[in-house]
């Protein structure tokens, strides 16, 4: 509270602030880079968008029109959680098409392999007490299969208080809730591979504009 009160009266260069935040997030998560966004839900939208567009500004400005882009996002049926809204709704906000696979309480690796295709842009993995408690593919195995097909893995860990271990388990992009973990104002944290973090942050040139912090 004292830190917030101390900085509020002063003007801040937001780009510089995000650079400082990136270093702090990288240190806290073990990721290469990171930034702060409006909330974790926003983080899902712009992370999916990043996996579809990369740093292509024309594609970024065109979303949610995904013509010519890989635009499918796979997710285990047992990970289709509702945290006030369905996670699949946030994925679709980017313009992506959701591909659910497996059953509510049981998913096999062969089903993930079958769900991945030429149009797959990303795979979403949820770590939460809201997700199916058993029967899901483990994150390391999930990531191994996706990476073998060149598909990045987005991990929604908004329900978690610990931020370590996800990069080592195979996450390419990580999403956390700042207010849950830090007790601060509503905000989301995006962390991960530097190239994907840059692409996610660049979504402020398009659909991510109303989601920036």
Regions found by a protein language model. Give the residues of each.
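Conserved PLP-enzyme active-site core in the AAT-like
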Residues: 1, 22-25, 30-36, 41-213
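A glycine-/small-polar-enriched, mobile loop at the entrance of the PLP active site in fold-type I
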Residues: 1-22
